[in-house]
């Protein structure tokens, strides 16, 4: 990894620290970059106008004993990757040919959105047990790299 990869991953980690997820280990950040310029950022948290999990002082998934990686729709949070893509859509910013830096490997739902957004490269730091997401990235021809310092 080069100095820019390190800088952008540090930025993704900073953005992830803004997460409103009740579970500290689920603070995820994502930034989308093109030509060394940040286009958008995203962190996982409740949609605008919805009470956050931190404010609720609970994780509904933990409360209902939902295993990690299952029933992803049963959560207040919008994923960091989704928020970065949504922000681009709201601002009219094209992500074609851009690189996404993400603190965690995306889930399959985010993988499909990343592919369709036009992002061409993903650099992630921490793994996530979702082999199908990686299979989709491979089939779509998206370059995926695990960040190593």
Segments predicted by a language model, with ranges:
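Zinc-dependent deaminase catalytic domain
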Residues: 1-149
């Amino acid at each position: 990894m080069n100095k820019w990869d390190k800088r952008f991953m540090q930025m993704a980690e900073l953005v992830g620290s803004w997460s409103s997820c009740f579970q500290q280990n689920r603070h995820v950040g994502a930034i989308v970059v093109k030509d060394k310029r940040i286009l958008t950022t995203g962190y996982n948290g409740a949609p605008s106008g919805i009470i956050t999990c931190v404010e609720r002082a609970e994780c509904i998934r933990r409360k209902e004993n939902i295993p990690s990686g299952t029933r992803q729709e049963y959560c207040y949070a919008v994923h960091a990757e989704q928020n970065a893509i949504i922000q681009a859509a709201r601002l009219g910013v094209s992500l074609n040919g851009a690189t996404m830096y993400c603190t965690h490997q995306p889930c399959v739902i985010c993988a499909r959105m990343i592919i369709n957004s036009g992002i061409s490269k993903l650099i992630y730091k921490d793994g996530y047990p979702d082999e199908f997401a990686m299979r989709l990235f491979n089939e779509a021809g998206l370059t995926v790299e695990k960040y190593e310092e």
